[in-house]
Design a protein with these regions (language model features):
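Non-heme di-metal
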Residues: 1-119
């Protein structure tokens, strides 16, 4: 994978580079390292690399989904109501679309994300 140093691209361009990087990592880089570790008798290290491959593959899947949302113009919209949370102040609202700005702290829509309730 290549990462153009010093360049800040568009969200679309950055996601495309990230997708390419993750793909390279799980299809070539880590499998090569796992094979080498296995060949040299380091089974635990090879197993760790195989588990990292699973994580990298998931990263690619997530970035592909994000790119799809960005390209469709529906990054801050869903077909059904969900909870949106402001990453700045924590304000939560249930809606199909994130607010244009946070009614609590006045930060723009870009500070909202689907709320994670994983505790």
């Amino acid at each position: 994978a290549s990462y153009p140093g010093g360049k800040i691209g568009t969200t679309r361009e950055n996601l495309q580079l990230a997708i390419a990087g993750e793909h390279e990592e799980w299809t070539h880089m880590y499998p090569t390292m796992a094979d080498k570790a296995e060949e040299e008798g380091f089974k635990e290290i090879a197993t760790a690399y195989h588990n990292i491959i699973k994580a990298e593959k998931e990263h690619e899947r997530r970035y592909l989904k994000l790119l799809e949302r960005v390209e469709s113009g529906k990054f801050f919209e869903r077909d059904e109501e969900i909870y949106w949370q402001c990453r700045n102040c924590g304000f939560v609202v249930k809606a199909k679309k994130a607010p244009a700005k946070c009614p609590a702290c006045d930060h723009p829509q870009e500070h909202f994300e689907p709320m994670r309730d994983n505790y």
